[in-house]
A protein has these predicted regions:
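Conserved GNAT acetyl-CoA-binding A-motif
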Residues: 111-119, 252-264
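A conserved beta-strand-loop-helix scaffold within acyl/acetyltransferase catalytic domains
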Residues: 194-224, 228-232
Length: 290
């Protein structure tokens, strides 16, 4: 990991994949004090303890150094921590003792941001600082031990109409995903195709040489991915998302990866349940209103 200091915060991130990190860390690099030491094992244990029991793969991505950053208030004895991941759109998870500096850092890092507080104290601080800038809403977590019905998923894939084709995301399709706003998040958290190929995984459905739907990795962690699914508005309600997700899930299982699903809406939760996922719990989140 590389270590930088900014505004009395300590920022840790993966050296190899630093280019995919949050914008403020790229643009302000020259202002940081570079420190070549590796995060002390004792410090990392304390950071892990701040997030104990929080079964969110984006947090796992940051903690295991695959993607994203861990930002803490103190290098030797952290009391507050932020796990943040994303480029065009980002998630920020706040743990430990509420710290306004961590909230302002996250808000300034990305305009398309979802913030998740660990407790009421964090939530109150977010609401007080952000005011009308944020929208409070409910997200839906699923269990992380789903036993999928593979034959049923295969049947979903076989329902693909003949005028559509499903492809794994290659370099050309990666670039195509970035050209449209609705499909950007399918690959947008990987700074280039080589990073996506190494860490990510995804499928798109094509009609007349244009991408119309897809299911891919929003993020990656050591043992799996967090699923992102998107469909062009003109092609919704045709079962294309179900088909793309079914193919992605099967491929993940073939590669011993867990395809995690965290639902933004009840509609997303219903799709997840259709694919075999089981609801775990609701949780509070805040979205920056652009």
């Amino acid at each position: 990991m590389l270590i930088y200091k900014q505004n009395n915060l300590i920022i840790y991130y993966n050296r190899e994949f630093c280019n995919q990190n949050i914008k403020f860390q790229i643009t302000d690099t020259e202002r940081f004090r570079k420190d070549t030491k590796i995060m002390k094992e004792q410090t990392m244990q304390k950071v892990h303890s701040l997030f104990t029991g929080w079964n969110q793969t984006i947090i796992w991505s940051c903690l295991d150094g695959t993607m994203g950053q861990i930002i803490v208030d103190d290098d030797s004895n952290p009391q507050s921590a932020l796990a943040i991941l994303g480029i065009n759109s980002a998630f920020a998870f706040f743990a430990g003792k509420p710290n306004l500096n961590l909230i302002t850092t996250a808000v300034n890092a990305c305009s398309d941001l979802i913030m998740v507080p660990q407790n009421t104290e964090w939530a109150n601080m977010i609401e007080k600082y952000c005011g009308d800038q944020v929208r409070k809403f409910t997200r839906y977590a699923t269990l992380k031990d789903t036993k999928f019905n593979i034959p049923r998923l295969q049947l979903n894939i076989e329902k693909l109409p003949p005028e559509f084709q499903i492809h794994s995301i290659d370099a050309n399709l990666y670039d195509q995903c970035l050209q449209k706003e609705w499909s950007t998040d399918l690959v947008g958290n990987y700074s280039n195709y080589n990073e996506f190929k190494k860490l990510g995984l995804g499928y798109v459905i094509v009609n007349d040489q244009s991408i119309v739907a897809g299911a891919s990795s929003f993020s990656s962690y050591q043992n799996g991915i967090e699923i992102e699914v998107a469909t062009h508005p003109d092609f919704q309600r045709r079962g294309l998302a179900t088909i793309a997700c079914s193919q992605l899930i099967i491929t993940c299982l073939d590669q011993s990866l867990y395809p995690s699903w965290d639902a933004h809406t009840e509609i997303s939760l219903h799709l997840a349940q259709k694919l075999g996922y089981q609801f775990a719990y609701k949780y509070l989140a805040y979205e920056i209103e652009e």
